[in-house]
Amino acid sequence: MSTYEISSETLAIIPIENFCSRVVEKDNTIIVNKTPMQIIEDSCSFFGSSYFGRAKGTKGLIGVSHKAPIIIEESKEIIFFPTSSPRLYECCWISLKHINRYQKQESNALVLFNSGYSLAVDMSYGSFDNQVLRATRLESVLRFRKNI
């Protein structure tokens, strides 16, 4: 597949070989001929903004600019966060709303999604927990502002 827009069904976007991605949805896995960052950028554009605009919005809302969570689409509260610097090829993007729980697995984090899918993430539990907390803060501010 050469194009993909993130939806409320998307759980994670994982880089694989040849600058492609494995996109995990609730009931499906799709191989996309784009990097995770390209999919994030395309999805931001699809919903009327740009990645840089969304990143600037995150900084304005919660003051985070490094490994910042991104609001892909506001009305459905689709928020993704990176597992490393988004500039790095190995960066995965995780959907906040689909996480059931996460736990430490050796030196990494294991993410358990509501659908039953699990993903071992190449980052420490503490770093993953921090990313979830940042994304949750962003979600909270977004909900508050939507209800004003």
Regions flagged by a language model, labelled:
Residues 1-93, 100-148:
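Eukaryotic intrinsically disordered, low-complexity regulatory linkers and tails enriched in Ser/Thr/Pro
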